[in-house]
Amino acid sequence: MSNLFSPAEVLRVLNGFNPWWAHRRVTVPEFRRTIYDACRKHLTQEHAETVLLLSGIRGAGTSTLLLQLAQDLVASGTDPRSVLYLSVEHPMFGMLPLAEILRIYREMIHPLDRHAVLLLDELHYAKEWDSQVKELLYGDNDYRIIATESVQMIERALVTETQVGRWASIAVPSLSFYEYLKLRGLDPGADGATPELEDLFTMKEDGLAAVAGALKPLVAHFPHYLTGGGLPGLATAADTSAGSSLFHEDAAERILRRAIARHFAARNVEDLKRLFLYLCVHSGEIFRVQRYAQALGVSPSTVANHVELLERCFLVRRVPPSGPGGTDVQKARNRVFVADATLRNMPLLRDPEGLGDPEERRTVVATAMLRHVAGRYARGLERITYWRDARGRGEIDAVVWGDGRPVVFTLTADSIKPFGFGDPVVDFCRREKVARAYLVSSDNRPALGVARFPGVETSFLRIPAHVLCYFLGRAECEVWKSGPAA
């Protein structure tokens, strides 16, 4: 296959991807995602791992991030020819072994004996990517590498086949509400006036009222975030519906048809597209595999496999139920969430006006809340489950189990109503010795408030969804300031 293209032809394409070699600037957004600093640190610190892998949904901004890194490295004095950006998804590069492309780069642009930065976009599209990644990890070179993948393949291979310390990984989620506000220059807490989320449990009413007042401007921006603010490319658009059809085509065709069909040999991509659309409509509900399989006329094992494929493409997230103490439940039925509210709403062509319907708003807010809870605890060993009362009297949307006492997040129909003994949520918190419970409202009416009950160790915080998402997103950003984790 390498004989199809001469080195000169390959070099022309490389030059197109790397305009800084000819001292030309590349146009990139000024906004830097939170993980940018961790990536820059990987490229500049000594004794770093050879490869940093960025894994996440298409459209989360990983390609832009690589180009921002390239531009900033060159601007800071790095030899332009020592910075190679490569979109492995390009048809020519997908047909050539990565080693052959790097050979041309070394012979015609930058010698092997000099330090180089490799920015490899969509590396899983590389020909024989598994052996090529091993060569990068163990080969005799002076490369510092950042690679991206929008299908969870490389990370799984690295976990099982390589040594700890040679690589690190970062999960790149969609924009949090906090990042969305920063992107639009709207952060009301930039002056340090707002406390940490956990501090709210110990504040008095006047302090909570002050926090609520400081964050009141967020109310107007939350609907736009829920319907189209999770992706950097759409977050700044005044009308997200303009990008809905484009995103739907990108998600359905490029992710489902191209990525899954190529990497997992899925035989019927149309079934995958139907399943994803069904999960968008029913995001956060318990997914009954048998019922769906019967309706579609396929086997339950096929449906279960398709859900796993969607999860490996970062389109959905499965949340299992939990038994006492966070134990596993036999024959568990998972709740399946679309990974982000924007991913859910774009294919359905939803707009902010649709949030006036209570059921629609609850579905969207539950999806956004789970994204923020998962993002906040993404770097730890915490496990996220849901809980349902055996008698069907109540449920908890997310329980975070870690080394310490569990933390609860649950949407409530009306956060103002009095809770007490006999309420299933309170009883669960008492039995499991929950540290903190967030009673989240999907509307903006309830004020911040703390409740406690005799004999229950848990502190309960009534909090509107937009305030919770702001604080969780900010905490998520703070975690990433410490750098990547292997």
Where in the sequence are the language-model features?
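N-terminal pre-P-loop "Q-motif" helix
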Residues: 27-43
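Conserved glycine(s) of the Walker
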Residues: 61
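Structural recognition of the conserved hydrophobic beta-strand(s) that form the central parallel beta-sheet
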Residues: 144-150, 171
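Interdomain hinge/linker elements that couple catalytic modules in large macromolecular machines
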Residues: 2-24, 187-352, 357-364, 371, ...
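A cross-kingdom feature that marks ATP-driven nucleic-acid transaction machinery
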Residues: 1-29, 47-50, 55, 64-65, ...
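Short regulatory helix/loop adjacent to the ATP-binding pocket of P-loop NTPases
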Residues: 153-169, 181-186
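Short glycine-rich substrate-engagement loop in P-loop NTPases that contacts/grips substrate
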Residues: 84-113
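The conserved Walker
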Residues: 58
